[in-house]
Amino acid sequence: MSCKRSYHRHCALVYYMVLLDLTNAVFEFSHPLIRDSGNSQSRQLLHHRLKRSWVWNQFFVLEEYTGTEPLYVGKLHSDMDKGEGSITYILSGDGAGTMFTIDETTGDIHAIQRLDREERSQYTLKAQALDRRTTRPMEPESEFIVKIQDINDNEPKFLDGPYTASVPEMSPVGTSIIQVSATDADDPTYGSSARVVYSILQGQPYFSVDSKTGIIRTALTNMDRESRDYYEVIIQAKDMGGQLGGLAGTTTVNVTLSDVNDNPPRFPQKHYQMSVLESLLINSTVGRVLAMDLDEGVNAEMKYNIIDGDEFEVFDIVTDPSNQVGVITVKKPLDFETKKSYTLKIEGSNAHLEIRFLNLGPFRDTTSVHITVEDVDEPPVFGSSFYFVEVSENVDIGTTIQIVSAKDPDATNNSVRYSIDRSSDPGRYFYVDVTTGALMTARPLDREEVSWHNITILAMEMNNPAQIGGVPVTIKVLDVNDNAPTFTKFSETLMCENAKADQLIQTVSAVDQDDPQEGQHISYSLAPDAANNPNFTLRDNQDNTAWILTRRPGFKQSEQSTFYLPLLISDNGNPRLSSTGTLTIQVCSCDKDGDIMSCNAEPYTLPISLSRGALIAILTCIFVLLVLVLLILSMRRHRKQPYTIDEEDNVHENIVRYDDEGGGEEDTEAFDIAALWNPREAHMGKTRQDMKPEIESLSRYVTQTCRMDNNVHSYMLAKLYEADTDVCAPPFDSLQTYMFEGEGSVAHSLSSLQSLSTDSEQSYDYLSDWGPRFKKLAEMYGTKDNNGSL
């Protein structure tokens, strides 16, 4: 194939070269040379812009020339050129010097580079003839065009390939699927190099392609997606009108058959067997059925219906959208004792139908489902789902207010026993007879305390105590008139001396805890013993309130400052209840505006010249002076006193223990009381004497005195910790040398080691002479005779 293509390419090249030579010959023949005669007339005509006589026109050159020699394009010649070599030809413009060159003497133009028409179809150049000796232009500069002749060197290309398309299955023949398009970079205006025709290389006999437009169509009927849903079609585009020697390109078209609803649903089973407990809850799943459909997507969507066997509408069936399964659920409670089995006829059909495929139907199918109800031991069931009881609050204890009844729904019909859920009756107001179900009161009821009771009565099977049923019972306690009305606010009432007759001085009100059906109404009146009270009267407002009014004017605080008015209130219940109360009325002195000034029998009055504002100012000044005095006393009390050591102040009454053995009578070193002020300084720098016996001096240790017990406790713990953690502490008694020990003491040293280190006889008889305080010590260190006598 490549050899044939090369052969045709060379033939076309030779043909175009011959055509080019003929064209140039015609151009040279049609433009005769005009030779310069050399006379003045010729020069004068030359200076008067004579018609230029360039022998040239547009040139043509073939693209893709691959020869070893430069490609001859054409020849430029001026009629002023006498062939003596006096004229120089110069070339400029597009590609001059790089793509094209010119012979300066002959004017021959050659192409020195391979030309590609698809990159550039023509070049515009400029030519000029110069006098070789003077370089003066012999002719004005002129333009000429070099056109690149096209050859068929580009195959068609599918720029948008590969393609993906879809077509519904079962489409009629000739259904358009997709249009493909190929482009050829060759010159469409010259020859047939760019004339493309389409053909199908792979995909017959299912598809066809239009040779001119590239439209792909179906070529077979009844293409079934369920049999094959994918096709790979290869399309060829060939130039030169599809003739032999043309170049070709291919592309791939992936065609997918989309689904249509052309398959009816079918149940793989014609009979299903299911079982379910009668205790299954409503909306619970009984089982699943599935009608298979070879279609997909919306064409496979199913809807299910129960068309027979469920006259009581106990079951329901819905479609699971995730897998198109029919889910059978319980719509009403099941009862083994009522019906033990069901046989349902279920239909499955497509949700979406296509009219043009109805002849392939029917698009529905049926199956039967047999459901067996299994018996379950059920708890007792009450005759009513709830009970509502009304009872008066004055009912006697043990009164039956309701009888409940429950029975075992199973075939065994076991006997039941009744009880009350005590969590619903924490006050234990009621109890129920275990056998009869009679609900009775167990303690007095009080509507004002609890007006509603919500209890739960339980029924339990005797043979199976785990089976317990319950029913709610709501008890409303009805009111009886057992509470007398009481005053809501009953306090002392103040009135002015200058009160007028029939003046309102107090509004009284009362409440009643009872709740009569006809509404609450409280009546007010004066007590019978005060019905003819000359000072005050009562007016019932008929709205559960009453006004206390003055009957006369002229009250005097000095004559009588306090009045007591007994009141009577009663309700409208049956029986009618009443209560009494006494209103205390205090007579006060008031100013002209009615503001109370004093309610005492002998009120304190200010001088006429002293106003209330002046009194407030005086009291404020007194208060400020008191604050200043207290502040000064407080500052003087907390003022820091100078640090002085007084003989009386140094008496702390503390017992000071020394850790040094006494110097006896010779211990005349003065005791520094300052150590008591800071006992820690005396202890700082203390070293262990048993670890360094050669120490020259021993610091005197003063015990720390603490005011609080917790400080003493902390100090003791610190010393104990120091002793416990000291790994160098000797577990033995060692001889210590103290510089404070006196030589002239009568008692000398009490060191046990020093005593044992001497050979002298040790006698402690002198301890008895020291008095009663050393009696115990004398007994411990007595003579041998004494020890023997003990």
UniProtKB/Swiss-Prot annotation:
Membrane topology (Extracellular): 26-612
Segments forming domain Cadherin: 54-158, 159-267, 268-382, 383-487, 487-605
Localization per Swiss-Prot or TrEMBL: Cell membrane
The record describes its membrane topology as: Single-pass type I membrane protein
Which residues does the record annotate as propeptide? Answer: 26-52
State the GO CC annotations: adherens junction; catenin complex
A GO MF term: calcium ion binding
- State the tissue distribution: Detected in embryonic posterior neural plate, embryonic neural tube, sulcus limitans and embryonic kidney.
Q: Which GO terms describe its biological process?
A: adherens junction organization; calcium-dependent cell-cell adhesion via plasma membrane cell adhesion molecules; cell migration; cell morphogenesis; cell-cell adhesion mediated by cadherin; cell-cell junction assembly; homophilic cell adhesion via plasma membrane adhesion molecules
Q: Which InterPro entries match?
A: Cadherin (IPR039808), Cadherin-like_dom (IPR002126), Cadherin-like_sf (IPR015919), Cadherin_CS (IPR020894), Cadherin_Y-type_LIR (IPR000233), Catenin-bd_sf (IPR027397)
Which keywords has UniProt assigned to this entry?
A: Calcium, Cell adhesion, Cell membrane, Cleavage on pair of basic residues, Glycoprotein, Membrane, Metal-binding, Repeat, Signal, Transmembrane, Transmembrane helix
Q: Which residues lie on this side of the membrane: Cytoplasmic?
A: 634-790
Which SMART domains does the record match to this protein? CA
Signal peptide boundaries: 1-25
- One Pfam family for this entry, by name? CADH_Y-type_LIR
Entry-listed glycosylation sites: N254, N283, N413, N454, N535
Major localization listed first in the record, in broad terms = membrane
Its annotated function is as follows:
Cadherins are calcium-dependent cell adhesion proteins. They preferentially interact with themselves in a homophilic manner in connecting cells; cadherins may thus contribute to the sorting of heterogeneous cell types.
Q: What is known of its domains?
A: Three calcium ions are usually bound at the interface of each cadherin domain and rigidify the connections, imparting a strong curvature to the full-length ectodomain.
Name of the molecule in the record: Cadherin-20
**What is the name of the gene encoding this protein?**
cdh20
